[in-house]
A protein has these predicted regions:
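N-terminal localization/anchoring segments of enzymes in phospholipid and broader phosphate metabolism
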Residues: 1-266
Length: 266
């Protein structure tokens, strides 16, 4: 704890609240959830891929007419921050549409999947094996039958019901490449935290259309629990059309290469 270079308030909170008053419970709790441990090989792979994709992104950015900061100098500072944090520069020439509920997002996504010509990449934290989840699977099956390359990555905990269903096998039989992010198994529990999950919600079609936001592949009734007076989640997504979709595709490809055996190269 003292050697982990955590912020001083965080270190003091662990010491004062748990470790000093109840040493055994405190040490056990810290070992369980105190450190963000993803496994050394995973961290090293992520760093290596991040560096590689960042270099390719720089070449892409400099090779095209993407730098708009000379025209909007007041945004140059925040653009630099975004580039450092996200490993991709802000890109101009995009059309954005807000999809304020699950129905509109799922309908638009299925329509774009049905119109896909080359590739579809999807990464979601929660993918339910019912309703909208089945509809998206059916759309991916149609796309794969047309010769579109499809890759699907879901979180091992958030999408556990989907993973245990027959839908992943349906996708594989249709020719869709499927992988599980941060899979849970007894060996991994010894060396990495299983509560650290991949919460991303990304879909990219043909490298030009992308979806992101808070909406998972679920119906609008997801999370509705009337007995405890909890209503359904109200999520929103953004549909992006333009070069910014490629930045989201880089995020997907980086995660995909870590979780699958496929090396995509360029």
């Amino acid at each position: 704890l003292l050697m982990s270079r955590r912020p001083v308030p965080v270190t003091l909170a662990w010491l004062v609240a748990l470790i000093i008053p109840v040493p055994f419970i405190g040490v056990f709790s810290y070992a369980l959830v105190g450190e963000v441990r993803l496994g050394r090989w995973r961290v090293e792979a992520y760093q290596r891929l991040t560096q590689g994709y960042a270099q390719k992104a720089t070449v892409f950015w400099r090779g095209g007419n993407h730098d708009w900061t000379d025209e909007c100098a007041e945004y140059r500072s925040i653009a630099n921050v975004a580039t450092i944090v996200g490993d991709m520069p802000p890109l101009r020439g995009n059309s954005l549409a807000v999809l304020a509920d699950a129905e509109h997002m799922i309908e638009a996504l299925i329509r774009d999947i049905d119109n896909a010509r080359s590739r579809i990449h999807m990464l979601y934290y929660i993918w339910m094996p019912t309703g909208a989840g089945v509809q998206i699977v059916e759309a991916l099956e149609r796309a794969a039958a047309r010769g579109v390359t499809c890759r699907v990555l879901v979180d091992g905990v958030g999408s556990k019901d989907f993973i245990r269903s027959d839908l992943p096998e349906r996708l594989r039989k249709a020719g869709v490449k499927f992988a599980e992010a941060l899979p849970v198994n007894p060996v991994r529990m010894l060396f990495a935290r299983i509560d650290v999950r991949n919460h991303r919600k990304i879909a990219v079609i043909d490298g030009w259309i992308a979806y992101t936001g808070s909406q998972n592949i679920t119906d609008s009734s997801f999370g509705y629990r009337p007995l405890v007076r909890v209503g359904p989640w109200i999520d929103a997504s953004i549909r992006i059309e333009g070069p910014a979709a490629q930045a989201l595709e880089v995020v997907f490809l980086r995660d995909w290469e870590i979780e699958s055996d496929e090396r995509l190269g360029d």
